[in-house]
Amino acid sequence: MSSDQEMAIFGEAAPYLRKSEKERIEAQNRPFDAKTSVFVAEPKESFVKGTIQSREGGKVTVKTDAGATLTVKEDQVFPMNPPKYDKIEDMAMMTHLHEPAVLYNLKERYAAWMIYTYSGLFCVTVNPYKWLPVYNPEVVTAYRGKKRQEAPPHIFSISDNAYQFMLTDRENQSILITGESGAGKTVNTKRVIQYFATIAVTGEKKKEEPGKMQGTLEDQIISANPLLEAFGNAKTVRNDNSSRFGKFIRIHFGTTGKLASADIETYLLEKSRVTFQLKAERSYHIFYQITSNRKPELIEMLLITTNPYDYPYVSQGEISVASIDDQEELIATDSAIDILGFTNDEKVSIYKLTGAVMHYGNLKFKQKQREEQAEPDGTEVADKAAYLQGLNSADLLKALCYPRVKVGNEFVTKGQTVEQVTNAVGALAKAVYDKMFLWMVARINQQLDTKQPRQYFIGVLDIAGFEIFDFNSLEQLCINFTNEKLQQFFNHHMFVLEQEEYKKEGIEWTFIDFGMDLAACIELIEKPMGIFSILEEECMFPKATDTSFKNKLYEQHLGKSSNFQKPKVVKGKAEAHFSLIHYAGVVDYNITGWLDKNKDPLNETVVGLYQKSSVKTLALLFSGAQTADAEAGGVKKGGKKKGSSFQTVSALFRENLNKLMTNLRSTHPHFVRCIIPNETKTPGAMEHELVLHQLRCNGVLEGIRICRKGFPSRILYADFKQRYKVLNASAIPEGQFIDSKKASEKLLASIDIDHTQYKFGHTKVFFKAGLLGLLEEMRDDKLAQIITRTQARCRGFLARVEYQKMVERRESIFCIQYNIRAFMNVKHWPWMKLFFRIKPLLKSAETEKEMATMKEEFQKTKDELAKSEAKRKELEEKMVSLLKEKNDLQLQVQSEAEGLADAEERCDQLIKTKIQLEAKIKEVTERAEDEEEINAELTAKKRKLEDECSELKKDIDDLELTLAKVEKEKHATENKVKNLTEEMAGLDETIAKLTKEKKALQEAHQQTLDDLQAEEDKVNTLTKAKTKLEQQVDDLEGSLEQEKKLRMDLERAKRKLEGDLKLAQESIMDIENEKQQLDEKLKKKEFEIGNLQSKIEDEQALGIQLQKKIKELQARIEELEEEIEAERASRAKAEKQRSDLSRELEEISERLEEAGGATSAQIEMNKKREAEFQKMRRDLEEATLQHEATAAALRKKHADSVAELGEQIDNLQRVKQKLEKEKSEMKMEIDDLASNVETVSKAKGNLEKMCRTLEDQVSELKSKEEEQQRLINDLTAQRGRLQTEAGEFSRQLDEKEALVSQLSRGKQAFTQQIEELKRQLEEEIKAKNALAHALQSSRHDCDLLREQYEEEQESKAELQRALSKANSEVAQWRTKYETDAIQRTEELEEAKKKLAQRLQAAEEHVEAVNAKCASLEKTKQRLQNEVEDLMLDVERTNAACAALDKKQRNFDKILAEWKQKYEETHAELEASQKEARSLGTELFKMKNAYEESLDQLETLKRENKNLQQEISDLTEQIAEGGKRIHELEKIKKQVEQEKSELQAALEEAEASLEHEEGKILRIQLELNQVKSEIDRKIAEKDEEIDQLKRNHVRVVETMQTMLDAEIRSRNDAIRIKKKMEGDLNEMEIQLNHANRMAAEALRNYRNTQGILKDTQLHLDDALRGQEDLKEQLAMVERRANLLQAEIEELRATLEQTERSRKIAEQELLDASERVQLLHTQNTSLINTKKKLETDISQLQGEMEDILQEARNAEEKAKKAITDAAMMAEELKKEQDTSAHLERMKKNLEQTVKDLQQRLDEAEQLALKGGKKQIQKLEARVRELEGEVESEQKRSAEAIKGLRKHERRVKELTYQTEEDRKNILRLQDLVDKLQAKVKSYKRQAEEAEEQSNTNLSKFRKLQHELEEAEERADIAESQVNKLRVKSREVHTKIISEE
């Protein structure tokens, strides 16, 4: 463990990587009992922490940390590790290793956001679902060069270890990042690439063309990810950024460890996502990035909108992802394209093709009238798509609707149905996108290939994770198979190879079987006769279906392989056909469409248009595709393409996967396991069972165990000796030879380590985990000691040298000092002075001579210097010019030398090519001669066949006579058959489904036992489901019949309304008129309310008792009123009561809002699911029960209110003592309340005076405790008295006819109360201030209660209307079960009246009360939105009903689906009804509160009368009272205005609701009509089908009599049966898909709120990610600036070079003239060479194609099963033969079609034997067609093929003679033989022509080669001359220098 200071280098990432030192100390000091602290198994959490309490009889009692006590077995208790192992970084170091220890270690680290943990030799990472600062640049720097044990676990550590291993071991490395989908593999892959691009940066740009390069190699490597993610990643159910393709990124390094280049291999892009997505998923990111409008110029260029919903291909699921900012991602993608060096044209092409794919989804086609042919439904979309692809829109539409098909010798247009065209468009869109993606990968690889020397690479693997969806198809099988192979690779590497290594090295080791072998599942998928093998085999048969594929799978594997199972049928889940047991779980697969996906066909006519597109990129994408036009033109290389084009998707996938596994096996792997912590993507949450499942599947525990038990580290003896000899050099004697193994043994024995931690093998020494790290530390310490000693020696030596210098300097100083002292002593001596004076004079004469001489020499030197300077300047100028000349000559010589070298190489290549071509010409010549012989043989055969055909013609004439008779006799029946065929074509699906079950049962006995069981299971399942649903319907009907007569009457009334729905418009107008005439409706509603109230009183006997109790309480209140004398105290209590009521009202309002939400949710569900109306059959009886429950709730509420009031009295008594403290709070409350009435300033002054008065009143409260108690009792009892108003209101409605509505009555009552209060306040001014606030509070409470009451009444009315509407819909589905029409009419009349009464009563409740304006506006808006949704749903329903007209038999299944939905919604209805009952209880509670508030007003009035005595004391407040009255009048007016506004808003909302009800009724009417129409059409279709069956039987009998074709009819039945089975499977899949979509929609609706919360979290993550991207963008911009500066420098250098070049050209004109001739000759030589190279490359291409096809033919010949296939393989050599055989095949097909028109399907099946021969000939023709170009080069093999062909012709002739016995077969074969004879004639003629042509070509090629030889000789001579001249120039330059 490192200290906090050492962790500081990691910056802000330190807390997320390792525990702090303080935390480690706390963990070590934490109390811990190793004997009692355990993990215990627990059902919910898997394992929990606990403490052992006792052990008895093999049982252990454990108390968990949560306080629960568990008693479990001994083996369910696991010991806990000491606290110091908490959050341990390497789980292999744990004391106790078991599942709970690993789980909790990961959980605790994850809770601390330490997402990386070592698990032995590999690393485990947990997806945090949030951004963490652990990938910053300082973290990268901190991990660089660190050993694994020196730094915390991290993906950077794994990457650095791989990098260091590559450098030290000189071995390729790979990093395998695996895990399930959504585990974080893609993010970790990007981090690995980021690390390598940072630490191995080259810092240099590649030398590319200007404008083509925008970044360094490391920038390009990093930028490849955003581009690939944009086009290859998408949102799935489990992952917002899921890689929908696999990629293996190889990063190549040079010898020094610097980046050299990189390349990317991709695997299996999920093409189907382009055109189809599930609801919770979306397509590839690029589509939504473009439509994000971040770059408006793209929107304009691509002719698209910014709304993805305008494009069906990309809007089938979700269109936005909270965690992804599509706008910013678009900028990153666009920048990546630029950085990766795409040209501007390529970039525009990428966007255009992407936009074209989006437009493809909008292409519409319709069926021509009276034809099945499809035609375009508008050309606007096609024009846009064609424009973007550089095509002609008319040609595109024509190619889609009328593709060209080759028939015989000609091309004909083929008609397409709408479905076929739609499928073709989808296939083209997927193909364009897939090919564009692969091209982008190839371009990226081309850009990343720097041509620098590279030695080793590190591969990073990122593939799609293991996927288990509700609907799993072929893509999921491929993905899961890849993960299975990788897991097997991991298991084999970790467990098998590791232990085999121990055995091989002779280490004592017991083999441990970890049970992790996945071979069974892998072999089941890929081995011969496995799933892929069977799939490819089925793709080879044209009539194969999904059903036949499934049957073969069952036959081959069901019951034979334990990993292959039959899926379980789960209600609500998509249909599955088989299940596989993978290592990560059981996956159910649906095989629908697998054959088409595997074959991946395309419209060849459209492909031909693509190849001619003006968009070069599109033409390039499809340049290698083979089309029909290309075949017609005889394009060369067509044979190769045709021979290799039929490669299935699964075969290509397996080939790529095998290459990947080969690459991985050749590297040293490093494993990173990614874990999903939870399914909800919640940060910090971990689901124990989910994580444990992944740990078990990934072999984490086993990997830790093998790491702990085994010896994961190993090193060769010689390397060990060399590296660790320094630990103890004395252990290895010097000067004598010693074996490396013995030296290693001695060395290890002499070191102080645990000797059980290593073993000696034959060639290596093996170490336990951690020991090698310990040795490294010891080595580092030893090296540190040695270096320290060396440094000490060096420092000592340097010090001694310095000391010696100091000694020498001191001796020199002593000598100088001695001489100076001696001089000082003698310098004043007289003789010395004389000596000083004379000595200079002695040399003066000589000095003068020397000076004169020196002056002369100086002058000469000066002159010479001037001359030399002038000369030097001349030489310098000349040197500069010569240097320029030299440089230019050097450049020229260098270019000439390079040109000479190139010319020499090309000459050598030409010579070699010449030799090769000569040999090839000889071979071709020989083959041409053989071809001539073959042609002669073919001519003889042709004559022989002509004789045979003449005989066959005679037979044909006889057959024609017979057929003419037959046709005359069946002419009458033929017309009937045609009519029936036309009708059955229109009803193809219906007839197929009706006859399918019968045919399936008839033919089931001819199937194997498994097929029989499968069919019976299907039939039984459907029958049981249908029976069960019918039984459920019967039970529901029985239960409804047992209900009360009232409910039956109401249901009959609703059934009657079905007939009346046709007059719905008139009823809606009547209802609207009634609403507009408010007075008339109010009177009616008052009468109906009286009826309802009387009914309620009859049904609620206990309610009467409650009213009696209310009256008693009222009498008691009257007695208490007389005793109230102290009103001043009542103010405080009233305020307290007000606050309590306010809180209660808030609670009620919250519940009302929740109830309103539930109500709106119920209405929304009713509108969105019209079928759910039938689920509400019991609604009205629940409404009646609701009244009974309301009565009981009232009784309970009364008792609760009494108890509550008692509790309030006690509370108030206790509160009394605290009134002094609460005085200030009351003052603030008074201020707040007054501020709501008038301005703050006026209210403040009044309330201050009132507060002073209240303070006086509070002082008096102490002496009036009893009076306060009575007052409290009075106030609390008022609620009981107000409850009596409920009964009184019903009577008041009859008594007060003058009242217009309940709202006006309340208004008048409030007005009277206000006026009375005004009079009382004028008379009683003293009491006014005390009561004014109480009055205001009471009125406010009344308003709130009234509003809540109104809301409850409105909610109740809405529920009643919704229930009535629902029941009316429910009744519609019951009409077909009613038989007694007359009785139903009478009952419906009575029930209609009752229902109208109840409807009017409900409307009266709505109109009688006010509602909050804001709430109604929101409700109105919400209802409008819901109605719009309902209209959309109705349109979809109508479409579904129209589809039902074509799918009569499917009606029962749809009915079962609706019944299932009925059960689900019925449960929801019950829940809603429970809520309605609770709301009813709350409703009565609100009514009582409202009445209590009114009673409080009356009580206050009486109290004001009692306070008249105090008027004299309050006279001084009269003026204030007047102001208060004025304020109250304003409040009154304001309240009245608000009431009028609310009433108007209510009326508008009510009108809106009634309008919506009218819409719903109209919809119901239309639905009922549609359903009745469906029933009628079903009956008609049944009759038509019966008639068709009878006619068909007669026709078949007639034809059997005339043609004796019973066998053919039986075969026809077999074919129809298979077709019916396929249709049945398709309909079952559609039904299951519909069920799944419905269930998914319901789940999405319920989970919306949770998703919104998750969205906020994702938004936060996205914001943080955006900040990261901004930082990265800034860094990229800085890099770009640096690159721009470098570019400018290069440009300056280039300009300078250009100027130098121009100067050199001027100075070297003479030299240019001499070299010009050489240039001219060289140029001509180069042109000649290029021409030769072109010719040779063409020849080489043709030779390579021929050789390749020869190898293919040899392989196919070995694999051939039948003689026909063998013959087909060997006849590929005959080009012309195959072309004419193709035309013959097409003619034969046309002939077959003509015969099919004259004969029915039975006759066609009778000719099945002939069709087999046709199929063989067709296969032979197709294969012959692919080998056209190889004819001339494989003549020897052609002879053998012709001989076999002769044998085959004899066999065919013999077969023909046998077929003559059968008239119909003979007719078909005769026609084919005629066509074949004609074809052979043309074939022989054209073969002769082709042979002559080829001979002429060969002679021409020989002549050209001779000329090439001459040119090569000339070139050689010219090269020699150039060499001589270059040497002369070079010698001249050297001599000049």
Swiss-Prot record:
Record carries keyword Protease: no
Comp. bias regions, Basic and acidic residues: 1126-1145
MF term (GO), any: calmodulin binding
Region of interest: Actin-binding: 657-679, 759-773
Any single GO CC term annotated in Swiss-Prot or TrEMBL for this entry: myofibril
Modified residues (Phosphoserine): 623, 1094, 1160, 1235, 1241, 1259, 1290, 1301, 1304, 1472, 1493, 1512, 1540, 1552, 1572, 1712, 1724, 1737
UniProt modified residues of type Phosphothreonine: 64, 69, 417, 1239, 1253, 1284, 1465, 1499, 1515, 1728, 1734
GO BP terms, alphabetized: muscle contraction
Phosphotyrosine modified-residue sites: 387, 1462, 1490
First-listed, main subcellular location of the protein, grouped into a coarse class: cytoplasm
UniProt: ATP binding residues: 179-186
Entry keywords, A to Z: Actin-binding, ATP-binding, Calmodulin-binding, Coiled coil, Cytoplasm, Methylation, Motor protein, Muscle protein, Myosin, Nucleotide-binding, Phosphoprotein, Thick filament
Coiled-coil features, chain-numbered ranges: 841-1937
Pros-methylhistidine PTM positions: 755
Domain Myosin motor: 86-780
Region Disordered: start-end pairs: 1124-1145, 1151-1170, 1883-1913
Residues with N6,N6,N6-trimethyllysine modification: 130
The Myosin N-terminal SH3-like domain, residue ranges: 33-82
Function of the protein: Myosins are actin-based motor molecules with ATPase activity essential for muscle contraction.
Domain note: The rodlike tail sequence is highly repetitive, showing cycles of a 28-residue repeat pattern composed of 4 heptapeptides, characteristic for alpha-helical coiled coils.
Family statement drawn from the similarity comment of this UniProt entry: Belongs to the TRAFAC class myosin-kinesin ATPase superfamily. Myosin family.
Protein name: Myosin-2
Species for this entry: Equus caballus (Horse)
Gene assigned in the entry: MYH2
